[in-house]
Amino acid sequence: SPDFAPYEFYAIDENGDPQLAGFDPALAKYVADYLGLELEIIPMDFDGVLAELANGTVDLGMAGLSPDPERADAMDFSDIYYLGGQSFVCLQANADKFPDLASTNKAEYSIGAQTGSIQVGLAEENSPDADIVLLTKVTDIIAELIGGKLDGAYIETAVAESYAKNYPELCVALEVPYDVAGSSIGVVKGN
């Protein structure tokens, strides 16, 4: 899911061509080299990563994947390789509207989350009265925030901070408690 910097994203190489970059592709290459295997990375939307793992059509999935217990029926997980967190993001100009998580729960708010992500559950849990808008790419969530179509969004902290650094009109307004703080590699069940 190459819209999830710093986990995975496209960077422009010295020839002006987009190249997959980030710490997930770097870790995947390291693991493949260590095991003496050939690595093939297939970029896809996040919800596609989950579906392909569940169907067994890929060997592993690396997409800032949280080892959520609800996913355990469909896949196995590596140990956590990155400890992170969850955040609520909004426009800097609207940060005062969100002093705490309870303030995100208003029917007049549109709150974004990435389809298939744990952030959907966080939105449903913390902002159940809001209009929860599911989008397949984090880049679409960011565009909707900046364009004023979303009031806020639930995004993994490292990703939220990366976007806020590149788009100063954005603000990481709140830390969001979550029991599973970190990322692991999703592996085909029983593999």
Regions found by a protein language model. Give the residues of each.
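Extracytoplasmic small-molecule ligand-binding "clamshell" domains
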Residues: 1-64
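Short helices/loops that flank or line small-molecule/ion binding pockets
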Residues: 30-34, 42-43, 47-60, 74-76, ...
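Soluble non-cytosolic domains of exported or imported proteins
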Residues: 18-26, 44-47, 113-117, 136-139, ...
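Flexible hinge/capping segments at coil-to-helix
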Residues: 91-110
